[in-house]
UniProtKB/Swiss-Prot annotation:
GO molecular function: ATP binding; four-way junction DNA binding; four-way junction helicase activity
Domain II: annotated span: 65-143
Protein name as annotated: Holliday junction branch migration complex subunit RuvA
Upper lineage: Bacteria, Pseudomonadati, Pseudomonadota, Gammaproteobacteria, Alteromonadales
Gene label: ruvA
CDD domains: UBA_RuvA_C (cd14332)
Function: The RuvA-RuvB-RuvC complex processes Holliday junction (HJ) DNA during genetic recombination and DNA repair, while the RuvA-RuvB complex plays an important role in the rescue of blocked DNA replication forks via replication fork reversal (RFR). RuvA specifically binds to HJ cruciform DNA, conferring on it an open structure. The RuvB hexamer acts as an ATP-dependent pump, pulling dsDNA into and through the RuvAB complex. HJ branch migration allows RuvC to scan DNA until it finds its consensus sequence, where it cleaves and resolves the cruciform DNA.
Any one GO CC term of the record: cytoplasm
Organism expressing this protein natively: Shewanella oneidensis (strain ATCC 700550 / JCM 31522 / CIP 106686 / LMG 19005 / NCIMB 14063 / MR-1)
Family according to the record: Belongs to the RuvA family.
Region (Domain III): 157-205
Length: 205
């Protein structure tokens, strides 16, 4: 089991990152809420991980805090929710926003996420209510608890920010026309791909 990685961030293109740990490169997938908090390339970083072994692949999922990882682990235990959908949920909203949806029985917001239908949303609200309560109690005293206060600083604008943003949204489960429309509507001159992804996601919720 790989529970944490500390190394140098050498590649990042949402939602995937590559971290060099003593000469070994680890590929991870991260929810965008965690991805936004990564440092610039070639800077040291620490991420908490969840390791998934399948017949055809071994996958690492990365998170900035233990609480975010704990929520991911609760999500994948819910009926009908696998790692991919859990990653999509935590990319579409922060952990605190998800907790708020559960507390308010907010199905309307949940079903706007790709891959989350009405039945899945209803199951999540029922199954997660008690689990989230205990998780939040356990996180009391944590530096950030469930509030994600990003210290993200946009990287210099790169070529094809729109293409990168569309690609990231498609990888999260959005259909290409839907992703393209959202990115085009959210794009403003000077935006880097990460800021554009965040704006496009916000416009769809």
């Amino acid at each position: 089991m790989i529970g944490r990685l500390r190394g140098v961030l050498i590649e990042k293109q949402a939602p995937e990152v590559l971290i060099d740990v003593n000469g070994v490169g680890y590929e991870l997938q991260m929810p965008l809420t965690s991805f936004y908090e990564l440092p610039e390339l070639n800077q040291p970083t620490t991420v908490y991980t969840h390791f998934v072994v399948r017949e055809d692949a071994q996958l690492l999922y990365g998170f900035i805090t233990k609480q975010e990882r704990s929520l991911f682990r609760l999500l994948i235990k819910a009926n009908g929710v696998g790692p991919k959908l859990a990653l999509t949920i935590l990319s579409g909203m922060t952990a605190s926003e998800f907790v708020g949806c559960v507390e308010r029985d907010d199905i309307v917001t949940l079903v706007k996420l790709p891959g989350v239908g009405k039945k899945t949303a209803e199951r999540l609200l029922v199954e997660m209510r008690d689990k989230l309560k205990s998780l939040m109690e356990a996180s009391v005293g944590s530096e950030r608890e469930f509030v994600l206060q990003s210290n993200y600083s946009p990287a210099p604008v790169v070529n094809s920010a729109e293409e990168d943003a569309i690609s990231a949204l498609i990888s999260l489960g959005y259909k290409p026309p839907q992703a393209s429309k959202a990115v085009s509507a959210a794009f403003k001159e000077g935006m880097d791909s990460e800021t554009l992804i965040k704006a496009a996601l916000k416009s769809m919720l």
